[in-house]
From Swiss-Prot:
GO terms for cellular component: TAT protein transport complex. This is Sec-independent protein translocase protein TatA. Part of the twin-arginine translocation (Tat) system that transports large folded proteins containing a characteristic twin-arginine motif in their signal peptide across membranes. TatA could form the protein-conducting channel of the Tat system. One of its GO terms (biological process) is protein transport by the Tat complex. Residues 56-77 are annotated as: Disordered. Its main location: membrane. The chain crosses the membrane at residues 3-23. It is a single-pass membrane protein. Pfam families: TatA_B_E. The gene is tatA. InterPro entries: TatA/B/E, TatA/E.
Amino acid sequence: MNVFGIGLPELIVILVVALLIFGPKKLPEIGRSLGKTKRAFEEASREFQDEIKRQTAALEEEQQAKAEAESPREISP
């Protein structure tokens, strides 16, 4: 298990220190808060990536349409 470069022994030490600092009653609340924050960050990141993809596709379509409009066409007699 290696989350953010933190192994299991380091994670245990962090949890013990958090337990000592915040106490057993406050720890679940902090965990829920961190979980909600993580989900919100992931959702914002996903929305950002989707918007970048949409903008890139729109720009490519615009460039393709411009190239087609500027390309010379054969005129048949």
